[in-house]
């Protein structure tokens, strides 16, 4: 029997994008009948479903059913123009998440390119050796964590400070290090929720990549789809 697992996806939106591509569904005019049926069929067939870990998938299933049922309700001709499309919220989430996935791929490619080069500092007389640049979490996990944080930004109050004009990698790097001077670890969700522009977000990821590569910081995740923490790395010197 073919095993269907959720481990290959980074959350319900990732699965939805997979189904949209597989069944050639227009993301701007989503067929809720097809998408809902295929999503629920997929969830029913998974062999590694753990409610404690994959609860988000079940929440999305109920949301899809809610949207589908709303679309089946008859609309008054007088209010058709004023009625909001029940799919609009889902469509916006999918498009935004798709953009962050693309960003993750771009950053991943940049990371691979940078790993081809190794810098020997002039005052470092130790034996030259390649630094292990493997990450404890993939970039797409960071993107997913950011997306979830943005969804919670109206209910989660940021607990750390972040400069409003953080546009350079140097500024973002300094900001991360300064926050780690005050705390042993930073909740990733709180940190990026305070980012106000996409420029800041990209800059933050680039700075975090550099700090992780030099082992100045490290990241950990206690459970799948749980909060991601930025912590002081082996070479942190704040």
From Swiss-Prot:
Cysteine disulfide links: none
Keyword tags: Cell cycle, Cell division, Chromosome partition, Cytoplasm
UniProt-listed GO biological process terms: cell division; chromosome segregation; DNA replication
Main location: cytoplasm
Keyword Protein biosynthesis among record annotations: no
GO cellular component term of the entry, any: cytoplasm
Pfam families listed in its UniProt record: SMC_ScpA
Protein's UniProt keywords contain Cell membrane: no
Subcellular location: Cytoplasm
Recorded superkingdom: Bacteria
Function: Participates in chromosomal partition during cell division. May act via the formation of a condensin-like complex containing Smc and ScpB that pull DNA away from mid-cell into both cell halves.
Similarity section: Belongs to the ScpA family.
Assembly mode: Component of a cohesin-like complex composed of ScpA, ScpB and the Smc homodimer, in which ScpA and ScpB bind to the head domain of Smc. The presence of the three proteins is required for the association of the complex with DNA.
Protein name, entry field: Segregation and condensation protein A
